[in-house]
Amino acid sequence: MHLMYYLNDEGKRVYTLKKVSPDGRVTKSSHPARFSPDDKYSRQRYTLKKRFHVLLTQLPAKPY
């Protein structure tokens, strides 16, 4: 059993253990993808995040 989710009418995630939502759509896995040290595309992901300013070091600091 894996935790799954689907989006409701308001766009919020609804978590479930079922493979199909009540309206008949297939649910998505709520778990992140596995980490692999042999990741061939990490450089491309890093470059895209840097280009669009979404790296954690490029974001403004959170107020505490």
Curated annotation (Swiss-Prot):
Organism whose genome encodes this protein: Schizosaccharomyces pombe (strain 972 / ATCC 24843) (Fission yeast)
Location(s), subcellular: Nucleus, Nucleolus
SUPFAM superfamilies with a match to the protein in the record: Nop10-like SnoRNP
Protein's UniProt name: H/ACA ribonucleoprotein complex subunit nop10
InterPro entries linked to this entry: H/ACA_rnp_Nop10 (IPR007264), H/ACA_rnp_Nop10_sf (IPR036756)
Task of the protein: Non-catalytic component of the H/ACA small nucleolar ribonucleoprotein (H/ACA snoRNP), which catalyzes pseudouridylation of rRNA and is required for ribosome biogenesis. This involves the isomerization of uridine such that the ribose is subsequently attached to C5, instead of the normal N1. Pseudouridine ('psi') residues may serve to stabilize the conformation of rRNAs. The H/ACA snoRNP complex also mediates pseudouridylation of other types of RNAs. The H/ACA snoRNP complex mediates pseudouridylation at position 93 in U2 snRNA.
Major location (coarse): nucleus
Family: Belongs to the NOP10 family.
Protein's UniProt keywords contain DNA repair: no
UniProt KW keywords: Nucleus, Ribonucleoprotein, Ribosome biogenesis, rRNA processing
GO molecular function term, any single one: telomerase RNA binding
A Gene Ontology cellular-component term: nucleolus
BP-aspect Gene Ontology terms: rRNA pseudouridine synthesis; snRNA pseudouridine synthesis
